[in-house]
UniProtKB/Swiss-Prot annotation:
<dbReference type="InterPro" id="IPR022893">
    <property type="entry name" value="Shikimate_DH_fam"/>
</dbReference>
<keyword id="KW-0028">Amino-acid biosynthesis</keyword>
<dbReference type="Pfam" id="PF08501">
    <property type="entry name" value="Shikimate_dh_N"/>
</dbReference>
<protein>
    <recommendedName>
        <fullName>Shikimate dehydrogenase (NADP(+))</fullName>
        <ecNumber>1.1.1.25</ecNumber>
    </recommendedName>
</protein>
<feature type="binding site">
    <location>
        <begin position="16"/>
        <end position="18"/>
    </location>
    <ligand>
        <name>shikimate</name>
    </ligand>
</feature>
<feature type="binding site">
    <location>
        <position position="65"/>
    </location>
    <ligand>
        <name>shikimate</name>
    </ligand>
</feature>
<feature type="binding site">
    <location>
        <position position="210"/>
    </location>
    <ligand>
        <name>shikimate</name>
    </ligand>
</feature>
<dbReference type="InterPro" id="IPR013708">
    <property type="entry name" value="Shikimate_DH-bd_N"/>
</dbReference>
<dbReference type="GO" id="GO:0004764">
    <property type="term" value="F:shikimate 3-dehydrogenase (NADP+) activity"/>
</dbReference>
<dbReference type="GO" id="GO:0009423">
    <property type="term" value="P:chorismate biosynthetic process"/>
</dbReference>
<feature type="binding site">
    <location>
        <position position="90"/>
    </location>
    <ligand>
        <name>shikimate</name>
    </ligand>
</feature>
<feature type="binding site">
    <location>
        <position position="208"/>
    </location>
    <ligand>
        <name>NADP(+)</name>
    </ligand>
</feature>
<dbReference type="GO" id="GO:0019632">
    <property type="term" value="P:shikimate metabolic process"/>
</dbReference>
<comment type="subunit">
    <text>Homodimer.</text>
</comment>
<dbReference type="GO" id="GO:0005829">
    <property type="term" value="C:cytosol"/>
</dbReference>
<dbReference type="GO" id="GO:0008652">
    <property type="term" value="P:amino acid biosynthetic process"/>
</dbReference>
<dbReference type="GO" id="GO:0050661">
    <property type="term" value="F:NADP binding"/>
</dbReference>
Length: 263
């Protein structure tokens, strides 16, 4: 039985649970796949060329995380699915010697929501994950607003039909989503009092970070607001990615059950 190498590309990367859940699937489904896959955490220098790194490492597939999702979009030979709309790639697969980019963050996020009847969302941040979420939520009919500290990247969201802000907008939002890297630095993405104001009129606080009670989620808990971390999104997007890695031999629902059992 042959070996194939996969990984997750990011900086930082040591916090990632992707190797744990993907390796569980590769071990479980090796007979169906006809190969044993091994999935590594790969720390890349910030200036890395994603395609060159992928090819030089001899990878068959990879996930892409902070801060490389938009850069990965730019270097693929082909882009498929919703990644075409959201300008960000979190899944790379070598298909017929071409580097093909997908985005499973978008659907992964939506599937992870325990309720689906939200009308509006405020996304904090403007990076690759924020783009994917905005595309998916707009597609589902939500009114989406984006708040970022600078105007960098906001053109994309304006073209998508989102309301964009660099200072805190007035109003209430059903969903408050932290798509910034603030939680990885143990910080709040917004001034505490401003965030409190939003939380008091919100229905759910969602942080894309996972594995610990972030300052963002801790504040929501303090205010008795329902909250959710990024664990569910991680497992859904990973299972959707695994379906791509397996050339659709293993459905995402089968992969999801294995991943959920180990994390």
């Amino acid at each position: 039985m042959g070996l194939k190498s996969f990984g997750v590309l990011g900086n930082p990367i040591k916090h990632s649970k992707s190797p744990l859940i993907h390796n569980a699937c590769f071990l479980t489904f090796q007979k169906e796949l006809g190969f044993l896959g091994h999935y590594h955490p790969i720390l890349l220098p910030l200036e890395s060329h994603i395609k060159n790194e992928f090819l030089n490492l001899g990878l068959s597939g990879a996930n892409v995380t902070l801060p490389f999702k938009e850069r990965a979009f730019q270097v693929c030979d082909k882009i498929k699915g919703i990644a075409l709309e959201c300008g960000a790639v979190n899944t790379l697969v070598l298909e017929n010697d071409e580097l093909v980019g997908y985005n499973t963050d978008a659907l992964g996020f939506y599937l992870s929501l325990k309720q689906k009847n939200y009308q509006s969302a405020l996304i904090l941040g403007s990076g690759g994950s924020a783009k994917a979420l905005a595309c998916e939520l707009k597609k589902r009919g939500l009114k989406v607003s984006v708040l970022n500290r600078s105007t960098k990247g906001l053109d994309f969201f304006q073209n998508l039909g989102c309301a964009c802000f660099t200072t805190t907008p007035k109003g209430a939002f059903d969903l408050i989503i932290n798509a910034t890297s603030a939680s990885l630095n143990n910080e709040l993405p917004l001034d505490k009092e401003v965030l409190k104001g939003y939380f008091k009129e919100s229905r759910l606080a969602y942080d894309l970070a996972y594995g610990f009670l972030t300052p963002f989620l801790s504040l929501a808990k303090e205010l008795k607001l329902p909250f959710q971390d990024g664990k569910g999104m991680l497992i859904y997007q990973a299972s959707l990615s695994f379906e791509k890695f397996s050339s659709s031999q293993i459905s995402y629902s089968k992969a999801f059950e294995i991943m959920r059992s180990v994390f």
